[in-house]
Structures are given as structure tokens and as C-alpha cells.
Regions:
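Extracellular TM2-ECL1-early TM3 structural module of rhodopsin-like
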Residues: 1-57, 62-70
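Hydrophobic residues within alpha-helical transmembrane segments
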Residues: 3, 40, 84-87, 127, ...
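Hydrophobic alpha-helical transmembrane segments
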Residues: 52, 78-83, 122-123, 179
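Intracellular effector-coupling site of seven-transmembrane GPCRs
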Residues: 3-4, 81, 145-193
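Seventh transmembrane helix
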Residues: 133-139, 177, 183-198, 218-265
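Loop architecture of class A 7-transmembrane GPCRs
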Residues: 22-46, 71-72, 76-79, 88-137, ...
Length: 265
């Protein structure tokens, strides 16, 4: 998931968005490099989204399905899931290679006017991110319901005279907070993109007109911004909730400050 998010930052933010607006690299604007970059950006975005779905399902099985957990939570299963997600993302994104004009790095007239492309864009929007949003909400709701039911049973079994906090209940509470945060973050950041993609086609993607500012275009760019932000926040949220990760981060910051003091003296 982290690797896919990093690829989104490199390909979508640095190689495309920043280049189109500020850098104007001729190499990235040539054909077929431009078309290939578009396919890679869409594929890595699909990977990022569906790895988030896979992580959500993995947490559901690990917490709620103890019998299935032994058979599912294996290295072989993880490898198969990664390969399927990567292959599926590439297959779904490849048709967009032919959406660009054959002479310059802009959308072709056929893409802008064809009903076939409009139907495929609708299909693309359903597969990513409408279906993932539904799956994430569903499995997180089932997981949270299981945790709440298990907490009620544990409280009933515990001796009423027992004092102090229950480490198991605290751990489950943190899991609920993590799942809720990931779900809310993903859904809220993707929602503007979903609204735009289900209603209008993408326009002025390569910023050929720097002064283009219709309300629909502003919604499109706002959706792009939040979509790209979503690709990195989920991994950060999950990482910061892990105790070992926080300890390593603190040690790294302490080392930098110590090194800075040594250099200064």
C-alpha cells in the first residue's frame, strides 16, 4: 500500500501535475510518453485504492474470522492479492492509452465525443472508486460491529470487582478508531472526484489553457487534489497508529537533532 501511494506521488504529482503547470518538460509531453504516463498514473491510483480495500478485508478476517484467518493470512495469499490487484489495475487503465490525440498530448476528439468512451469512463468510475468505497464501508462496519459485540461479552465475563483498565478493550477501541479514521478519510477525499466523474468528462487535463476556470473545471481540479491527497494519507494514518513506527520516528528525529548539535559545536 505504501509503495503504491509513493508511485502515485511520483507519477501523478511530480511527473504530471507539477510538470504540466510549472516545469514544461518536453520529454514528458511527447508521444507515446504522454500516453504511457497517463496509463501508469491511472494504474498506480487503482493499486493504491484497491490495496486499501485489501487491507480493510485483511483486518476484517484477522479480527472477525478466526477460522479463516489461519488459511487466509499467509504469505502466498498476500502475494496472490498483490499480483491480482496490479494486473487488474494495468488491464483497466490500458485503454486510456488510446484516449490521447495521435499528434499532441491532449485528449482526442473521439475520446471527447464518443459514447463508447463515456460508457467506459462510467465503468472506470464505478470500479475505482465507487465500488471500493462501498466495500470499505461494508467491511469496516462489520468489523466495528464485531468489536462492539465482543466488548460487551468481555465486560459481562469480567469480574465486577476487578479494577483498572482492560488492555484488550483498549486495543479494540484503538482498532475501531483506526478503521473509522481510514474509512472517513478515504470517502471524504474521494467524494468530489466521484461526483464529477459520474456527471462530466475530464477536460483540460494537461492544462493547455492555464486560464480555464469554469465551475465544473474547478470541481474537477478540487477532486484531483483531494484524490491525490488520499493516496498518501491512509498510509500515514496507519503508520502513525503503530507503536513501533512512532518509536522509530522519535528515534530518527532525536538522532537528527543530536547530529545537528554535534555539527554546530
Amino acid at each position: 500500500m505504501a509503495a503504491a501511494d509513493l508511485l502515485v506521488v511520483i507519477l501523478a504529482v511530480i511527473a504530471e501535475q507539477i510538470n504540466y503547470i510549472y516545469m514544461f518538460s518536453d520529454f514528458l509531453l511527447t508521444l507515446p510518453v504522454c500516453s504511457l504516463a497517463l496509463v501508469l498514473r491511472l494504474a498506480t491510483t487503482d493499486w493504491s485504492v484497491w490495496f486499501t480495500v485489501a487491507f480493510t478485508i485483511d483486518r476484517y478476517i484477522a479480527i472477525c474470522c478466526q477460522k479463516l484467518r489461519k488459511r487466509y493470512c499467509t504469505e502466498r495469499t498476500a502475494t496472490m492479492v498483490i499480483l491480482i490487484v496490479c494486473a487488474g489495475g494495468c488491464a483497466k487503465s490500458t485503454p486510456f492509452y488510446f484516449a490521447m490525440d495521435r499528434r499532441r498530448c491532449v485528449a482526442s476528439n473521439e475520446y471527447l465525443t464518443s459514447s463508447g468512451w463515456r460508457i467506459y469512463e462510467l465503468f472506470d468510475s464505478i470500479i475505482t472508486p465507487l465500488l471500493p468505497i462501498c466495500l470499505i464501508l461494508l467491511f469496516n462496519a462489520l468489523t466495528i460491529r464485531h468489536i462492539i459485540a465482543a466488548n460487551k461479552v468481555r465486560r459481562a465475563v469480567r469480574n465486577s470487582s476487578e479494577n483498572g483498565k482492560d488492555p484488550e478493550l483498549e486495543s479494540r477501541k484503538k482498532s475501531m478508531i483506526l478503521l473509522f479514521t481510514l474509512s472517513a478519510n478515504f470517502v471524504l477525499l474521494w467524494m468530489p472526484y466521484v461526483i464529477h466523474s459520474l456527471t462530466w468528462q475530464t477536460e483540460n487535463y494537461t492544462y493547455a489553457d492555464k486560464y480555464f476556470s469554469t465551475p465544473i473545471y474547478i470541481l474537477q481540479q478540487f477532486g484531483f487534489m483531494l484524490q491525490l491527497l488520499s493516496s498518501c494519507t491512509n498510509t500515514c494514518i496507519y503508520g502513525l497508529t503503530q507503536r513501533k513506527f512512532r518509536e522509530e520516528l522519535k528515534n530518527g528525529l532525536k538522532y537528527l537533532f543530536t547530529l545537528n548539535r554535534q555539527v554546530g559545536t
